[in-house]
């Protein structure tokens, strides 16, 4: 799946396990990632628009300078890895978790965040200080 700088529309990766890939620069539009698992995947510069990422798990992934807009992300988990410079806009992120994830300069704009979990020593202070998150 090393398809850099392309657009993937309405692709169904529901339940897939993707390991050790570089998909930097890919635009995902209307993709379904429900219950998918990504480990050590490089998503640098990717965009996700109107995707379903419910109960999707991202482990030790590099997710820098991404745009995520209009996505359903109920129960998504981000474990380890990096989310630096990423913007989430108009996403449903209820019950999502960010565990031991570097989240410097992350923006969550007009996102539903009820029940979100942030877990890492000192991470809550980092998020409040360096991210624009409405009504934490």
Q: PLM features: residue spans?
A:
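Tandem repeat scaffolds
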Residues: 1-136
């Amino acid at each position: 799946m090393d398809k850099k700088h392309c657009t993937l529309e309405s692709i169904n990766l529901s339940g897939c396990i993707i390991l050790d890939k570089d998909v930097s620069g890919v635009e995902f539009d209307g993709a379904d990632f429900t219950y998918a698992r990504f480990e050590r995947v490089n998503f640098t510069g990717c965009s996700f628009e109107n995707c379903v990422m419910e109960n999707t798990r991202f482990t030790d992934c590099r997710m820098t300078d991404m745009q995520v807009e209009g996505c359903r992300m109920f129960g998504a988990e981000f474990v380890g890895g990096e989310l630096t410079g990423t913007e989430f806009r108009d996403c449903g992120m209820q019950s999502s978790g960010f565990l031991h994830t570097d989240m410097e300069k992350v923006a969550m704009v007009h996102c539903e965040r009820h029940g979100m979990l942030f877990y890492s020593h000192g991470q809550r202070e980092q998020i409040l200080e360096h991210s624009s998150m409405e009504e934490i």
